[in-house]
């Protein structure tokens, strides 16, 4: 509905250009917002006030002119001017009912799909040297929610798990694995549970033994040169590490697969060409033996030029080099329209520099959008980055285990007579959902406090509340098994029916915001408001005990669409629903 009103206004402004009321080359920014006070209509715009200078008219006069020239629309019951020149639109109840009717049974819930784009989404991307920890959670689940929503809206999505599977640390790891094999024979295996121990032991040997450090550096050179023995060990290590990652993904309900892994090593053969091309374009400068690029717009606080280091003095490459190669691949091979990077906000400057350089060097098409969708940190209740009691990094599997244990206690306390298998399944869903939703419901760019107590509450904007809200709506149909709704029609008469209908009609607008800005918290807030709107409707408008069959069937259809929207919305967040709690 919002986009429909925007279209009416765009048509009107275009006619003003043709009539000479506005300059022919005038670019208008039209904003339509939902009103908070329904006495002021359903939607409002301040476009008349924005155009007053260009049109040479006072805002109220221009507002009336806009109203007089609006194309006819069955969706609009009336239009009024308010205050200094706001234009308020009142939506026709029967038109809204028809829109909701069309959404029932439609796989996209009546949402008009945008023109499809090819969108590359770079998310999760852990280093393969260690087990996944809580620091990987935000990129993984925020990215996955946006991916799911993009696909639901008809876009072609290419997932890219840009894992850290290359670099100098792998020489250290290979050297230590080599020592273990020498001591324990070819049967020695690195167990998943030993990843952290293995890394720490290798680092300790590297720091304490000059001989070991020399061997590690030799193995890096051999690995980069394509040595078969080193590559075999490297692949084995990566396989073990990736297996761990994908166990975590499966447990989290994340859609990443092995086929989506396209790590740093995938661009090894392209790095020399990146350097050569930058040199050929006259962009490279030598600084202390390193090859760097200076861009005028990037300077330190003291005004000194801030370089992008492309190649170190010893010939090694850096993240910037790999990122430039990846951008070129995503532009020229994957043909992306947008590339979204879900990476910590602390990398903002890095991405600003490499995005700018990629465009400057013409490594990417001018029309390809490069977007760093950064995020804040997960903090403990002391406001500091989330750690174990001993100050260590919290492993993601340990966090999920704790969530499951707490959820099981919670569900058992509410269902003391439930069988263990059902308890375990409900606890699994509630525990994982609580962790994911607590993160997704926060503004992506904000830090947030991690609290098991808050996230497992059945009150407020939490996963348990929404999961219960869904089971409550779906439960109506367990008591209405003999009702035929095939010929039923939605009729909006009661104010709470209209409120629920208006909220249901906003689903498409909300999803557009999720994919345009990479902000799943907007969807979380919407689902919470939808659950509240249904609760108010259910209290005020008897469903199964309605006054007559027509009213009963209409309210059942509203309930059905609410259940479908809640379920789809939670699914887009990567959250399973339950039929009972």
Swiss-Prot record:
What GO terms describe the biological role, i.e. biological process, of this protein? arginyl-tRNA aminoacylation
Q: Where is this motif: 'HIGH' region?
A: 126-136
- What GO cellular component is one of the record's annotations? cytoplasm
Give the Enzyme Commission number: 6.1.1.19
Q: Is NADP there in the keyword field?
A: no
NCBIfam families, A to Z: argS (TIGR00456)
Check the record and name the PANTHER family matching this protein.
ARGININE--TRNA LIGASE, CYTOPLASMIC, ARGINYL-TRNA SYNTHETASE
* Name of the molecule in the record: Arginine--tRNA ligase
Q: Which organism is it from?
A: Shewanella oneidensis (strain ATCC 700550 / JCM 31522 / CIP 106686 / LMG 19005 / NCIMB 14063 / MR-1)
Lineage per the UniProt record:
Bacteria, Pseudomonadati, Pseudomonadota, Gammaproteobacteria, Alteromonadales
């Amino acid at each position: 509905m919002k986009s429909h009103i925007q279209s009416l206004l765009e048509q009107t402004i275009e006619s003003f250009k043709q009539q000479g009321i506005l300059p022919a080359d005038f670019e208008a920014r039209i904003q339509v917002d939902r009103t908070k006070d329904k006495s002021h209509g359903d939607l409002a715009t301040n476009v008349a006030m924005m155009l007053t200078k260009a049109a040479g008219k006072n805002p109220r006069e221009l507002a009336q002119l806009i109203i007089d020239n609006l194309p006819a629309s069955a969706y609009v019951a009336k239009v009024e001017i308010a205050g200094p020149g706001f234009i308020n639109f009142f939506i026709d109840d029967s038109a809204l009912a028809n829109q909701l009717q069309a959404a029932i049974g439609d796989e996209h819930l009546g949402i008009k799909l945008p023109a499809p784009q090819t969108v590359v989404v770079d998310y999760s991307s852990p280093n393969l040297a260690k087990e996944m920890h809580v620091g990987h959670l935000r990129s993984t689940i925020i990215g996955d929610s946006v991916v799911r929503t993009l696909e639901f809206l008809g876009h072609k999505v290419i997932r890219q798990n840009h894992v850290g599977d290359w670099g100098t640390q792998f020489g250290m790891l290979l050297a230590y694995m080599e020592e273990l094999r020498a001591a324990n024979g070819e049967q020695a295996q690195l167990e998943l549970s030993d990843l952290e121990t293995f890394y720490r032991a290798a680092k300790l040997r590297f720091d304490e033994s000059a001989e070991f450090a020399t061997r590690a550096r030799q193995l890096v050179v051999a690995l980069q040169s394509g040595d078969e023995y080193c590559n075999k060990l490297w692949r084995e290590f990566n396989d073990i590490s990736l297996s761990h990652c994908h166990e975590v993904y499966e447990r989290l309900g994340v859609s990443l697969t092995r086929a989506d892994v396209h790590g740093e090593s995938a661009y090894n053969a392209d790095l020399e060409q990146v350097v050569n091309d930058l040199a050929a374009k006259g962009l490279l400068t030598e600084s202390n033996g390193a090859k760097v690029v200076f861009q005028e717009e990037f300077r330190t606080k003291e005004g000194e030029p801030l370089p992008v280091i492309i190649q170190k003095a010893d010939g090694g490459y850096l993240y910037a080099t790999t990122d430039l190669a990846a951008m070129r691949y995503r532009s020229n091979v994957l043909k992306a329209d947008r590339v979204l990077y879900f990476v910590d906000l602390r990398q903002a400057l890095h991405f600003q520099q490499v995005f700018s350089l990629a465009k400057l060097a013409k490594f990417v098409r001018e029309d390809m959008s490069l977007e760093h969708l950064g995020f804040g940190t997960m903090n403990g209740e002391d406001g500091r980055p989330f750690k174990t009691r001993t100050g260590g990094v919290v492993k993601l599997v340990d966090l999920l285990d704790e969530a499951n244990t707490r959820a099981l206690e919670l569900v058992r306390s509410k269902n003391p007579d439930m069988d263990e298998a059902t308890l375990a399944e409900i606890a699994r869903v509630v525990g994982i959902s609580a962790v994911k939703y607590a993160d997704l419901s926060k503004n992506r760019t904000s830090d947030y406090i991690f609290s098991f107590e808050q996230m497992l509450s059945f009150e407020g904007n939490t996963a348990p509340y929404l999961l219960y809200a869904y089971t409550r709506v779906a439960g109506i149909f367990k008591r209405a098994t003999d009702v035929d709704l095939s010929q039923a029609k939605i009729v909006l008469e009661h104010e709470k029916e209209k409120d629920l209908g208006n909220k249901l009609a906003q689903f498409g607008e909300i999803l557009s915001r999720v994919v345009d800005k990479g902000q799943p918290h907007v969807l979380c807030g919407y689902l919470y408001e939808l659950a509240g709107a249904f609760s108010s409707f259910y209290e005020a408008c008897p469903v199964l005990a309605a006054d007559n069959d027509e009213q009963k069937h209409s309210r059942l259809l509203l309930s059905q669409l609410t259940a479908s929207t809640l379920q789809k919305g939670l699914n887009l967040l990567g959250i399973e629903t339950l039929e009972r709690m």
